């Protein structure tokens, strides 16, 4: 746009597209009328002649770039192979590993790890801190819920409701090792539901981990109330940062790998 266009007493300009030039708009304002008195408009090519390098500014920027590169460029771990998380509504290798890391580190029976909190479709085999934080951008506490087998069954059934598979917004979870669930969508029931190879004991207490976001919405997400949980025992905060727990686990265990094991099988 060579000249400004005035529309409803508003000056409109455009410096073109791309990064070849920038626009310069010098405006003199009449403070008595609170209006533009005079103006000049020009486009300035972005080149060495019109935009010389500012070495002081470059050095200032590079100082902080070096610091961020040092922080985010460090190695966290190496997996045996790349681990995938292609969909939030299925068991995934990366989801299983994350659930296992929290279960083992926090000493609980079952970890329900929100699938949506894993933000990368894959991770590894070389995992830099930048990759790690991109995959796990959220950082929350983990709560331990003492629940009965009957209640855990109800919680799992809740996130496997049909809306999860028809595109509606629901919460879905990755299961830690020991869990084996076979769910029939057509019959809307469990064909199998075991923990460590045994059926869940209806009145047996299981220590189940959930992150703060899910803890704050237990009824809509998992069909259980905090009052029901507290009737079984005290709810405890096991960690204030699940991301720190996962990072430490990854750093302490090199060449980790996971496969689709059948922890969660969805049948039509």
Residue ranges and their predicted role:
Residues 7-9, 106:
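Short, structured coil segments at secondary-structure junctions
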Residues 16-105, 109-268:
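Catalytic centers of hydrolytic enzymes
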Residues 5-6, 156:
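Short, function-defining helix-loop hinge/capping sites that tune catalysis or transport
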Residues 1, 12-15:
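Active-site neighborhood of phospho(di)ester-bond hydrolases with catalytic His/Asp-centered motifs
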Residues 2-5, 182:
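Short, exposed beta-strand/loop patches in secreted or surface proteins that constitute
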């Amino acid at each position: 746009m060579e000249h400004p266009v005035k529309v409803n007493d508003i000056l409109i300009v455009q410096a073109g597209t791309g990064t070849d030039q920038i626009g310069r708009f010098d405006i003199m304002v009449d403070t008595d009328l609170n209006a533009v008195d005079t103006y000049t408009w020009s486009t300035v090519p972005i080149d060495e002649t019109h935009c010389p390098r500012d070495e002081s500014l470059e050095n200032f920027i590079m100082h902080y770039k070096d610091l961020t590169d040092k922080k985010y460029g460090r190695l966290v771990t190496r997996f045996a192979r790349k681990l995938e998380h292609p969909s939030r509504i299925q068991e995934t290798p990366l989801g299983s590993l994350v659930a296992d890391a929290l279960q083992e580190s926090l000493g609980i029976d079952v970890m329900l790890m929100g699938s949506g909190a894993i933000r990368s479709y894959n991770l590894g085999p070389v995992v830099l801190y930048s990759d790690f934080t991109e995959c796990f951008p959220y950082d929350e506490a983990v709560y331990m819920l003492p629940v009965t087998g009957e209640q855990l069954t109800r919680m799992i059934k809740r996130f496997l409701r049909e809306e999860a598979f028809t595109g509606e917004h629901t919460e879905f979870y990755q299961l830690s090792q020991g869990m084996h669930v076979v769910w029939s969508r057509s019959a809307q029931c469990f064909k199998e539901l075991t923990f460590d190879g045994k059926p869940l004991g209806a009145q047996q207490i299981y220590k189940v981990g959930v992150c703060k976001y899910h803890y704050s919405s237990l009824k809509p997400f998992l069909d259980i109330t905090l009052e029901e949980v507290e009737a079984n025992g005290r709810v405890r905060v096991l960690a204030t940062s699940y991301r720190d727990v996962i990072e430490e686990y990854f750093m302490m265990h090199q060449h980790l790998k996971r496969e689709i094991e059948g922890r969660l099988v969805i049948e039509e």
